């Protein structure tokens, strides 16, 4: 649900959401539609009613990313791939005559055992660690990845209906924030700021307070949004394509790049 608090937003959001439906084509789950103020509040009772004009509802999907990753690994193993968890690339190996990459040296992070593997092709799909692997081949290569940290918080389930989420496409600093029902709880997020690459990113109190403040803008004034309602919080790192002309990560387009 996209709540609308100004009449000009109705055609603005409507055109964008209908374009979303059009791109989805025959795979679209259901067509989007407009809700009156009365119906929007019936579906999302905690929504702020002051100046509310109505809401636009569109359909999207959810999936459990952790389970999906496990399913991908198991499927790959079933078709003959060797799946090596907790294994890091220590260095890339080159043919001394041609300079062509021919393999890598790996390290088991649990036992510290190291060994070499040969490869005809090396695919670097390591997300925020992309540049560290690329520079193993050539330390002079320019960076193509801008790591950005995003934080989510988990709130009690009563913060959102069991079958309806809420999206705010324009927060106080131009980002997008959402509340989504998940496993009888409510997930709210996200933040977006540049960061250093780490294996264990963690949310800051500033990140959590930002999300809570944005939530307060869209919920009824009778709802006391408390810090104590945050049941848990986590952070992840997005590997955004580096654009030197963009000062902030929230202004960087979510593009993809293939570097051969």
What feature does the model see in each segment?
Residues 1-43, 177:
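Dinucleotide-binding Rossmann-like beta1-alpha1 core, especially the glycine-rich loop
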Residues 21, 41-79, 103-105, 113-117, ...:
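Helix-loop-beta segment of a Rossmann-like dinucleotide-binding subdomain
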Residues 34, 83, 116:
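Short aromatic/basic micro-patch
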Residues 67, 75, 132-187, 193-260:
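C-terminal catalytic lobe of FAD-dependent flavoproteins
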Residues 82-84, 231:
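General small-molecule cofactor/ligand-binding pocket signal
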Residues 85-102:
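A conserved short coil-to-beta-strand element within the FAD-binding core of flavoproteins
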Residues 110-121, 125:
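Core beta-strand elements of the Rossmann-like FAD/NAD(P) dinucleotide-binding domain
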């Amino acid at each position: 649900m996209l709540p609308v608090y100004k009449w000009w937003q109705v055609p603005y959001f409507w055109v964008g959401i209908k374009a979303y439906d059009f791109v989805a084509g025959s795979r679209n789950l259901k067509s989007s539609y407009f809700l009156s103020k009365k119906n929007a509040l019936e579906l999302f009772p905690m929504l702020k009613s002051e100046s509310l004009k109505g809401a636009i509802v569109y359909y999207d999907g959810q999936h459990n990313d952790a389970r999906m990753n496990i399913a991908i690994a198991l499927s790959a193993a079933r078709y003959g791939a060797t799946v090596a968890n907790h294994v890091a690339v220590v260095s890339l190996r080159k043919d001394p005559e041609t300079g062509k990459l021919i393999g890598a040296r790996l390290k088991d992070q649990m036992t510290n055992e190291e060994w070499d593997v040969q490869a005809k092709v090396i695919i670097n799909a390591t997300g925020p660690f992309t540049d560290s692997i690329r520079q193993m081949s050539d330390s002079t290569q320019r960076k193509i990845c801008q790591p950005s940290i995003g934080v989510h918080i988990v709130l009690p389930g009563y913060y959102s209906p069991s079958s309806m989420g809420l999206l705010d496409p324009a927060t106080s600093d131009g980002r997008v924030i959402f509340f989504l029902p998940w496993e009888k709880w409510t997930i709210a997020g996200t933040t977006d700021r540049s960061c250093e690459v780490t294996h264990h990113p963690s949310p800051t109190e500033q990140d959590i307070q930002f999300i809570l403040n944005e939530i307060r803008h869209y919920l009824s004034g009778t709802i006391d949004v408390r810090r104590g309602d945050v049941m848990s919080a986590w952070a992840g790192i997005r590997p955004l394509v580096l654009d030197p002309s963009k000062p902030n990560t929230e202004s960087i387009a979510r593009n993809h790049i293939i570097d051969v």
